[in-house]
Amino acid sequence: MNIMAHLIPVKCSRFLAGIIVSLVAGPALAGEINTGYFGDVAIKGYDPVAYFTMSKAVKGSEKYSHRWLGATWHFSSPEHKKNFQVAPASYAPQYGGYCSDGVAYGQATANIDPQAWRIINGKLYLNYDPGSAQELEEVDGQLEKAEANWPEIQKKLAAK
């Protein structure tokens, strides 16, 4: 039995799935990546993949950077950069990296703390501070409010 004959289709299907997710989610995020008040670096230079693979906030390096949706994303390793390049929408924070709890209140709060994060249902949510992250996770309906408010906030951000 040729094991490579079985592995190649699996690798290709994961790659294609990543491409499809990026194509579908990319337009929804286009132009809406929070880079703070100055510069063009997403998540204040933190590695978006590390939240998923290491379960912690890890500062990325300019050495491993990638441009996506008008922002520069930093990574802590070449592997994390590659993972992101294959499926960026799988790792990018929800609501363009704006404070998720703020979005629940109808506000696009640009100042986030990369240490104040949650992964809920396989998605990354960044917040202004640890209290906001806790509120997003623990208050019933908070995430649903954010989901409902995000389309209107996107329109306002696009109009700026």
Task: Map each language-model feature to its residues.
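Generic low-complexity segments that are intrinsically disordered, proline-rich and/or Lys/Arg-biased
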Residues: 7-10, 28, 152
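Bacterial N-terminal signal peptides that target proteins for export
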Residues: 2-19
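Charged, low-complexity intrinsically disordered segments
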Residues: 30-160
